[in-house]
């Protein structure tokens, strides 16, 4: 008989059992195994500028020296903001490619001459553009591959059996985790579990990660935030106080009203920007989490939720990136379903309350609890099991 109980499992479920599975831990893994990928993400992603993430510009350069093995015994520079913010919301910040910084670096490496000049070489021209592609690929395909390898190293901490939860083993499970601890630790049948973003047993590099930002909407928001900055004004002052037409690539690419009137200085810079913009757009498209197609591919699961009477959310942050899945669940279930949602911090309580308002869940149909409470219930129901 099909169970009327659905569990929705998030990363907090594995964290509760002692698995070091936060994205901050993934950062530590990259530092040990793929520092170039780490350096790329630290330097070029997130709303903070490259300089503000480090104590000095020399530290920025040392990131790449160390990651490429060019530094003898150097220690990776401490990036407080990256460690405390960027990686805690890793998937969200995949949408925060710092276009400005990438174009600044491109401008440095571009040949300082025109295509018809004697000193021009196409290999120099494509060196910068290929560098952009390498950087973006390291945060796309290489990042996915390394994430999968890291997932396969995860384990629950010693003594986790004392913390096992009282879970209905006949229920249905929708998990956002890639780990298989529901099967290997709790003995849940694989046929009862839907791994919505993939499982560690899938082909390497196939796990689904990505941001939820709308490409067009995110771009417009970025332009609006930056359009009044001094560096994006049509005219700038040089060190002697003389005005000159803004020639920064980010300004020419995104804020110049008439491209034909820009201070491009050479056709090389103009052509390079057009190619770079195309590569940026490809990156955003590849790294946007395809929730609509994922939901469509799992429609059999969602259509089967009509009989659900109780939903238990264990360790899920109820983040915006996953709301489309909850929208589809809400469409499939009845209006009298009882919810129980775990919380860990005061911020979680606020998220749960906002979640209930969004879906019209009254307070008498939503029980908030800590995962430790389920562990206590397990001790009461089956004291010999641990």
Regions found by a protein language model. Name each.
Residues 20-30, 188-192, 328-329, 356-357:
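Short secondary-structure boundary/capping segments
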Residues 31-46, 339-347:
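Short, conserved aromatic-histidine micro-motifs
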Residues 30, 164, 182-186, 333, ...:
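Hydrophobic, Leu/Ile/Phe/Ala-enriched alpha-helical segments that form helix-helix packing faces
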Residues 1-17, 169, 281, 285-288, ...:
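SIR2/sirtuin-family catalytic core signature
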Residues 40-277:
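Extended, H/D-rich, highly charged conserved domains that either
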Residues 1-40:
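An N-terminal structural lobe/cap that precedes and organizes the functional/catalytic core
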Residues 19-26, 37, 143, 147, ...:
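Phosphate/oxyanion-binding active-site loops and adjacent basic polyanion-contact surfaces
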Residues 9, 27-30, 194-199, 369-370:
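Conserved beta-strand -> loop -> alpha-helix junction used to position metal-binding or nucleic-acid-contacting
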């Amino acid at each position: 008989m099909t169970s009327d109980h659905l569990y929705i499992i998030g990363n907090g479920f594995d964290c509760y059992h002692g698995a070091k599975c936060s994205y901050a831990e993934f950062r530590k893994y990259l530092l040990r195994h793929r520092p170039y990928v780490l350096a790329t993400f630290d330097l070029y992603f997130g709303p903070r500028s490259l300089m503000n993430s480090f104590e000095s510009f020399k530290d920025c350069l040392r990131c790449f020296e160390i990651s490429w093995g060019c530094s003898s015994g150097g220690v990776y520079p401490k990036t407080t903001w990256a460690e405390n913010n960027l990686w805690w919301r890793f998937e969200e910040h995949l949408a925060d490619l710092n276009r400005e910084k990438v174009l600044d670096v491109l401008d440095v490496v571009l040949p300082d001459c025109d295509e018809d000049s004697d000193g021009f070489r196409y290999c120099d021209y494509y060196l910068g553009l290929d560098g952009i592609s390498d950087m973006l690929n390291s945060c796309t395909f290489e990042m996915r591959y390394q994430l999968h390898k890291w997932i396969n190293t995860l384990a629950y901490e010693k003594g986790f059996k004392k913390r096992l939860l009282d879970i209905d083993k006949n229920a249905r499970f929708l998990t956002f985790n890639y780990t298989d601890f529901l099967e290997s630790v709790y003995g849940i049948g694989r046929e009862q579990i839907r791994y919505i973003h993939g499982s560690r047993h899938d082909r390497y590099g196939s796990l689904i990660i990505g941001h939820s930002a709308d490409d067009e909407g995110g771009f417009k928001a970025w332009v609006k935030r930056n359009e009044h900055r001094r560096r994006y004004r049509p005219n700038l002052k040089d060190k002697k106080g003389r005005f000159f037409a803004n020639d920064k690539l980010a300004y020419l690419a995104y804020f110049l009203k008439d491209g034909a009137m820009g201070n491009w200085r050479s056709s090389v810079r103009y052509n390079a920007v057009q190619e770079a913009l195309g590569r940026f757009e490809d990156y955003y498209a590849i790294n946007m989490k395809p929730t609509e197609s994922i939901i469509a591919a799992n429609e059999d699961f969602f259509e089967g939720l009509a009989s659900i009477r109780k939903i238990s959310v264990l360790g899920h942050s109820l983040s915006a990136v996953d709301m489309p899945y909850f929208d589809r669940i809400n469409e499939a279930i009845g209006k009298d379903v009882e919810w129980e949602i775990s919380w860990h911090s005061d911020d979680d309580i606020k998220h749960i309350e906002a979640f209930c308002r969004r879906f019209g869940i009254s307070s008498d149909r939503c029980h908030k609890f800590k995962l430790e409470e389920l562990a206590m219930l397990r001790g009461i129901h089956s004291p010999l099991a641990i």
